[in-house]
Structures are given as structure tokens and as C-alpha cells.
């Protein structure tokens, strides 16, 4: 029997590039399989998805060699309409997938295009709304829903077409930890009940392995480096060599001396034989320093309308030299809090800077106290050349040209961008663009740098580079605020966690202490790391084991 999806010596080169992105790939996927495709940024994994769903060659043009077939049909001979009946795609950003004004309209969109009879359309919308727990939301606007609800709507919108292949392009990228876990649960449930061929493109390996997959395919530099079971992959060094983060518990077990290469069931912590592993470490706490309050936020309130309060009487302090992680579920008010701190929105309440009420700050004045770096650097960049982008804020402030050059070159050196100072921004990677946006803020000398999801969508290599860079800035005396869904980032790179839930502060404590409070984690849609699960298996103190992990990672980074 022929494979349902088959790449044979398949290569693809974008018209805009000199070298092929995919290089003589030979790969097959059987009908009904559940496959995870992983790889670092720029590896070619997304290009595989684009070739399957028709984005290539219908939107992105290029030259293909070899063959790619789905159900025996040559993909490049099919129209985009024909491909849509073979492959349904759930995009990384659900907001980019919504068509209808209501959830019901959005679900019905594909059926309307297929001229399905009204009676059948209502039946199928009702069926899929029921399967994905959307019955109560059918008359709501998709844009008003939570991150997890949006994901279910976009899923229903493609599942309703009942295509045999379901393709997920980084489905976890914009979700809080619990919503991400629920999404993996949902994908697994749909795979089993709808009997689809399921392909997940992600780099968050541990999160996807929350539910079983049949195979993992590792791609880098346009080639298949591994094609086999998750257990076999975890026994190799391929993840570390190719910039993919392995499960946290596997990293800890390596440090504790477990013979990884000869261990079964590595992909499932519950099934691991840990009889030869133990941990008896204790906690050595650093002497806390007397905090120096930099910002004092008192009774902060904000609402888009009287019926829709977003921030509810928030009060907290930010200390000089701190690394503060702001966490919470999608829609909790984290980004709104950031906008209020930066004076982008009018709020009720008071913000004091070193004891001075700064309510009368202009946006310009506030930006010199708090520099805000957006999640997507492309939304901040407006100039063609790197030097000009970093210099823009100074030029707008009328700074003398000689001072501009001096300050820009200094900050480019700090950000590791000096050698690229004459480059066009278009030649940079995503991570480098992120550094450019940070440099454009740093050059204004703000006391605080506020970053929205600083590592979103980045593989382990770029994640580590970004966080090491932020650590260097912190060592230079900058106070860092990070809005994040990444529990490992919070654990390793912050001193304090502020948990926001429904516009209120649910907790304000050290990250490790937070992980030991399951009720707070549940309310805020956060989750414990697998280090805590491993500690339960080893019958040891999870906080001590977490400290051990952080100490080991610190040693590796030096």
C-alpha cells in the first residue's frame, strides 16, 4: 500500500533565495498517523507545511524538484480548492483565520463556499459545535473569546470540512500553559475520534509529547535528520545539537546520572524506571537584599466600558534591578497592565517613580522611564537600515548628530549588533530583529525594559541567546519586566512572579514558591514544570530539585 503522503527526493527553492530550503527530502506519512515535525527556526519545517496545504506555490513562488503526493495525487497538479479538501490547516494565530462575525458564521464559512444545503449546514455546525464545546458561544464574536476558545473555533472551522489531513502550524505559540495543554488534549481526541492523519509543526517538544505521537521528524537545514519514535530521539544528542529544548525532566535525569541511552519509555515520565535514581539535595537560600523601590503602583484600574473592567485595583511595587515576570492566562490583563505602565492608555490610580507621582507624564516622558519592546519586532521596525532604526528615537528628540552616532554605536556593541551596523534590517533573522528593537529602546536610556513575550516562537538556540543577552543587560543595572507564558523562562530568568487573573493580582512571590501552589496555578491557567512531576516520582523536595536544575543550567551557560 502506498503512503498517504509521500515526498520523494523533494527539493524546493523560493524565488527570492539562492539556495533551496528543502534538499532532496524523502519522507512518507501513513494514513491515520500522528506525526510531529520539529526543527529550529529556519530549518524548513514550515516550508514542508506550506507545500502540503498549497501556500506553496499559490502564495510563495519557487522551483520544486522531485515529487510530493497526497493520496496518490501530485500536489503541484492540484488547484488550491482541491488541496483544501485534502488538507485542513490550523494557523499559529487563530485571529488570522476568522472570517465570520459570529462563531456560527465562522464554522459555516467552508460549507457556504461548497454550496452545502442549509439544512445540512445547520446540522454540521451543530455537530462540530457540540464536539468542540462551542454550543454556548455560537453567537459570540470570535475575537472576544479567550485564547483556548479561539483555538477551538479555528479547529471547528477546518474540521467541519472533514478533510483527511489535519495540519497544525505551531498551535501552542500564543497560548498560556494550561490552554496549550488543553489544545494538545483536543488534537489527540480529534485524531482518535475523527481518524485524521495529523501533522503538528512545533518546536515545543515536551508540550506536544503531553499526549502520544507516532513519530517525530527532525528537520534542519532542509534535510531530515531523524525519523522515528520520540523515545529513540530522546536517547540521542540530536536535540541539543540542533537547538531544540528537550523535556526538563530528561535534562535533570541526565545530570542525576541516568543512563539515558539504555532507558525505555523516555517520552513518558510516568512509565520511566527510576529505581536507580535518587536526589537528596537541599536548598541553599541567598541572603535577600534590601529592596530599593523604583515604581510604586497603587489602585490601578482600567475599563474599555463600564461593563468590561480589565484592571481591577492593582497595587504592587517594582524594585530597582529586579527581573519581574508577569504571568497569567490569555485575557487576564497582562498586556493592558503593560500599556498602562507605558502611558499608552488612560487609567485610574497612581504610579509613583522614586516617590514622585508621574500621572502627568507624556508618552515621551514615560518612554524615558520604561522602554516597551513588542512581541513581534516587525511591528516596531520602520526604517530600512539598522543604524537608522536604532537612531530614530534620538533623531525625533532632536539630539545632535555626533551624540547620536556615539550613543547608537555604543548600544549596538552592547546588543551584539555592531558588526551589522551598515546592514539592512531585511537581512536579519527574527532573533536579530528582536535585538534591534531592544537596541532602539536601550539607546533612550530607560530605567526599565518591559518585554512582551521575549522568546515567543524561538527555538532553544535563539531562546538561550536572547535570555543570555537580557541577563547581560540586567547585570549592567537595567530593571527587566517580562510578560510571558513560558514557565521555564519564569523559573530560570526571573526573581519574582506577578500572577494576574481577571484583572487582579492573584499572587506576588518567587517563581519557585509559585510552582508549589497548585490552586493558584489552576486559577491562572499555569502549570507546574515536569521537574515537579519528577520530584514526586523521586519522593524528594520539588523546590530543592528545581534549584538543582537552575544551578546546573547556570554552570552550563558559563
Swiss-Prot record:
Keyword list (alphabetical) reads:
ATP-binding, Cell membrane, Membrane, Nucleotide-binding, Repeat, Translocase, Transport
This protein's source sits in the domain of life called Bacteria
Which Pfam families does the UniProt record give? ABC_tran, DUF3744
Q: Tell where it localizes.
A: Cell membrane
The membrane topology noted for this protein in its Swiss-Prot or TrEMBL record is:
Peripheral membrane protein
Q: Which residues are involved in binding ATP 1?
A: 39-46
Say if the entry is tagged with keyword DNA-binding. no
Say where the protein is mainly found: membrane
| UniProt-listed NCBIfam families | PRK13648.1
Its name, as the record gives it, is Putative ABC transporter ATP-binding protein SMU_1934c
> Which organism's genome codes for this protein?
Streptococcus mutans serotype c (strain ATCC 700610 / UA159)
Taxonomic classification, please?
Answer: Bacteria, Bacillati, Bacillota, Bacilli, Lactobacillales
Amino acid at each position: 500500500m502506498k503512503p498517504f503522503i509521500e515526498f520523494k527526493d523533494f527539493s524546493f527553492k523560493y524565488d527570492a533565495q539562492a539556495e533551496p530550503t528543502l534538499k532532496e527530502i524523502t519522507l512518507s506519512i501513513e494514513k491515520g498517523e500522528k506525526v510531529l515535525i520539529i526543527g529550529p527556526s529556519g530549518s524548513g519545517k514550515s516550508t514542508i507545511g506550506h507545500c502540503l496545504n498549497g501556500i506553496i506555490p499559490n502564495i510563495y513562488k519557487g522551483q520544486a524538484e522531485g515529487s510530493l503526493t497526497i493520496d496518490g495525487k501530485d500536489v503541484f497538479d492540484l488547484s488550491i480548492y482541491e488541496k483544501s479538501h485534502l488538507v485542513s490547516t490550523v494557523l499559529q494565530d487563530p485571529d488570522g483565520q476568522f472570517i465570520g462575525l459570529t462563531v456560527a458564521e465562522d464554522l459555516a464559512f467552508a460549507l457556504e463556499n461548497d454550496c452545502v444545503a442549509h439544512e445540512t449546514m445547520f446540522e454540521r455546525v451543530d455537530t462540530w459545535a457540540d464536539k468542540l464545546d462551542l454550543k454556548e458561544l455560537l453567537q459570540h464574536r470570535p475575537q472576544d473569546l479567550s485564547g483556548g476558545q479561539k483555538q477551538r473555533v479555528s479547529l471547528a472551522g477546518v474540521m467541519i470540512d472533514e478533510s483527511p489531513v489535519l495540519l497544525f502550524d505551531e498551535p501552542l505559540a500564543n497560548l498560556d500553559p494550561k490552554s496549550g495543554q488543553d489544545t494538545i488534549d483536543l488534537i489527540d481526541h480529534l485524531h482518535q475520534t475523527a481518524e485524521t492523519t495529523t501533522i503538528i509543526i512545533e518546536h515545543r517538544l515536551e508540550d506536544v509529547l503531553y499526549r502520544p505521537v507516532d513519530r517525530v521528524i527532525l528537520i534542519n537545514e532542509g534535510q531530515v535528520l531523524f525519523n522515528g519514535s520520540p523515545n529513540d530521539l530522546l536517547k540521542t544528542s540530536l536535540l541539543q545539537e540542533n537547538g531544540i529544548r528537550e523535556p526538563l525532566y530528561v535534562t535533570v535525569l541526565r545530570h542525576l546520572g541516568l543512563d539515558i541511552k539504555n532507558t525505555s519509555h523516555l517520552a513518558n515520565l510516568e512509565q520511566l524506571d527510576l529505581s536507580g535514581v535518587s536526589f537528596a539535595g537541599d536548598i541553599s537560600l541567598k541572603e535577600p537584599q534590601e529592596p530599593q523601590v523604583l515604581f510604586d503602583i497603587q489602585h490601578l484600574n482600567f475599563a474599555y466600558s463600564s461593563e468590561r473592567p480589565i484592571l481591577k485595583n492593582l497595587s504592587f511595587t517594582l524594585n530597582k534591578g529586579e527581573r519581574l515576570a508577569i504571568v497569567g492566562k490569555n485575557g487576564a490583563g497582562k498586556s493592558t497592565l503593560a500599556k498602562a505602565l507605558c502611558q499608552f492608555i488612560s487609567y485610574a490610580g497612581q504610579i509613583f517613580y522614586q516617590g514622585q507621582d508621574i500621572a502627568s507624564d507624556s508618552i515621551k516622558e514615560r518612554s524615558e522611564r520604561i522602554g516597551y519592546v513588542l512581541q513581534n519586532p516587525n511591528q516596531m521596525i520602520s526604517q530600512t537600515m539598522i543604524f537608522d532604526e536604532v537612531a530614530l528615537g534620538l533623531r525625533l528628540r532632536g539630539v545632535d548628530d555626533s551624540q547620536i552616532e556615539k550613543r547608537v554605536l555604543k548600544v549596538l556593541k552592547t546588543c551584539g549588533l555592531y558588526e551589522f551596523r551598515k546592514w539592512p534590517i531585511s537581512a536579519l533573522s527574527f532573533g536579530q530583529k528582536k535585538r534591534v528593537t531592544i537596541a532602539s529602546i536601550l539607546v533612550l536610556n530607560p530605567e526599565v525594559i518591559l518585554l512582551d513575550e521575549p522568546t515567543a516562537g524561538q527555538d532553544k538556540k535563539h531562546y538561550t541567546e536572547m535570555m543570555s543577552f537580557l541577563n547581560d543587560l540586567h547585570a549592567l543595572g537595567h530593571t527587566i519586566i517580562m510578560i510571558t507564558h513560558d514557565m521555564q523562562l519564569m523559573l530560570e530568568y526571573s526573581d519574582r512572579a506577578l500572577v494576574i487573573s481577571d484583572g487582579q493580582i492573584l499572587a506576588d512571590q518567587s517563581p519557585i514558591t509559585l510552582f508549589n501552589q497548585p490552586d493558584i496555578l489552576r486559577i491562572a491557567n499555569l502549570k507546574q514544570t515536569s521537574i515537579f512531576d519528577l520530584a514526586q516520582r523521586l519522593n524528594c523536595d520539588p523546590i530543592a530539585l528545581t534549584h538543582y536544575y537552575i544551578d546546573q543550567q547556570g554552570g552550563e551557560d558559563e
